[in-house]
Amino acid sequence: MSLAKLCESISCHETNIISDSDPLFSWIMSPQSSLLNPEIKSYPISKSEPLFALCWSLGTDSHLWASLKPADPPFRCRIPFPPSKCTRLHTHDYLELAYIVSGEFSQKILGKIITFREGELCLIDKNCLHQDILDKSPSTILFFGIANSMFDDIMNSHVAEKRITAFLHSALMKQKNLQQYLHFRPHDDARSDMEASLTQLLLELIR
């Protein structure tokens, strides 16, 4: 199964649909509001799980379908949004890696609007202020949340790209006031291998 089909299956076909009263509903997508203070998104599952995945499917009907893995019980949610709606300004207490499975996806990071295209990735450090921009153009985004406990494992792996190494070292050293992100555009010949790895990782989280 392709990564796109797997993400669609997770976010759009799970039978258990949670209501907007569920705390995970607002964690997945908090709309922009008049609140001045940024939201701090905490790690949503047990810290014993070093990694989680969040699948977003944005459709032309101005609805976001989403699901979190691992989750017990499994669920999905359907969230309406007006075109070009922004989420609430927020940070995370974990690293976030976003991969654009299909379509395009825009974020406002540190006050700058950046559009990511199919096959591109964005790695956002903790405490980096950003907003997600929801558009009615069809797109699928796969987010991975990386817990602090996983930093050592990442740092011990063989990472060829020096910028990634520097970024992770900075995060690992807990320079909490340093706000940063990285935008990656993999070569076309590397995309199939990368998607195969992400697919396998997602399958492991689904269990």
What are these regions (language model features)?
Residues E104-S106, C122, K126-D132, M150-D152:
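Histidine-centered metal-chelating micro-motifs
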Residues S2-S21, F25, L36-S46, P50-R78, ...:
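A hydrophobic/aromatic-rich effector-binding and dimerization subdomain
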Residues D93-L95, C128-H130, T140-L142:
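Generic beta-strand structural signal
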Residues H90-Q107, I146:
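Short, conserved beta-strand element in jelly-roll/cupin
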Residues L6, D93-Y94, V101, R117-E118, ...:
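Short, well-ordered loop/turn elements at secondary-structure boundaries
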Residues L110-K126, K136:
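Short acidic-glycine-tyrosine-enriched beta hairpin
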Residues S67, R78, K85-H92, K108, ...:
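Short histidine-centered beta-strand/loop micro-motifs
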